[in-house]
Amino acid sequence: PFDMSVGANIVLSSIIACNASEKFGYAGLIIAPLICGTIIGLINGIVYIKLHISSLIVTCALSLIYEAFSVYATNGKNVILSADYRAFGDYPVNLILALIAYLLCAFILKYTKIGTYTYAIGSNEVVAKNMGVNVPKYKIVAFTLAGFFFGLQAILTISFGTSMTSASNLSSMSRNFTPLMGTFFGLAFKKYGHPVIAIVIGEMIIQLMFNGFVALGAPTTIQNVVTGVALLVIVALTTKPVKGLVVK
């Protein structure tokens, strides 16, 4: 399953973090987006499992709802993070938080039952189910954990950008493609090592590419074209065609 509510989750969690920091300081800045992101992930997983429809459709539809909440939370205005609570936007604090997220994700995938079952479901859902894995349960867990990490990203996003604008009409979707490209890159090269390492390398390559465009003064339209082509190529490399199927 795919989660296309990444952008909406980050936008709403960032807004919640900014508002919470005004009342609770750094405690609110850290705890509020983690709770918000986790709850959004849990909702995504439950709705996806209960409705039995494509995760793309479910998360796109839910993104509209989360964006509406972001408009309500800001009254249509920008929220600005106080200068007293921007430490996570500066080096080395931002790097430390990113490293913690990386180590936590790698640990979950490699050393826990959740990681083992996630790999099994991702490789072959039918086989995993026949082996006794509670597939619906662990899909919900995967969505929930993803939401937690989106909450972590929200902390970095609001701290670095210092402000956040509410989203509407799926405008938050623009935030989805960079992390998706890194994820597909990780899937393409996971056989050569740990997938989390591959994802980090993929994201670094993508950011270097974007920074190169900025340095060259390339227009945004060209950047979007290259991003789209790169996404298609990476997805093509990670997709396993099934032969012998007859479309009726």
Question: Where are these predicted regions, by residue range?
Answer:
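Single transmembrane alpha-helix segments in multi-pass membrane proteins
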Residues: P1-K23, Y48, L180-G193, I197, ...
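Hydrophobic alpha-helical transmembrane segments
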Residues: A8, L12, A27-I35, I57, ...
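Membrane-interface helix caps of multi-pass small-molecule transporters
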Residues: N19, L42-K50, Y72-A73, F107, ...
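Alpha-helical transmembrane segments within multi-pass membrane transporters and channels
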Residues: F24-S63, I201-G202
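Helix-loop-helix "hairpin" substructures at the membrane interface of multi-pass membrane proteins
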Residues: G25-A27, I31-P33, I39-N44, Y91-T165
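Transmembrane helix-bundle core of multi-pass membrane transporters
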Residues: L51, S55-T112, I140-V141, G161-S172, ...
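Cytosolic-side transmembrane-helix boundaries in multi-pass membrane proteins
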Residues: S123-K137, M209-K248
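Transmembrane alpha-helical segments in multi-pass inner-membrane proteins
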Residues: F150, T165-V225
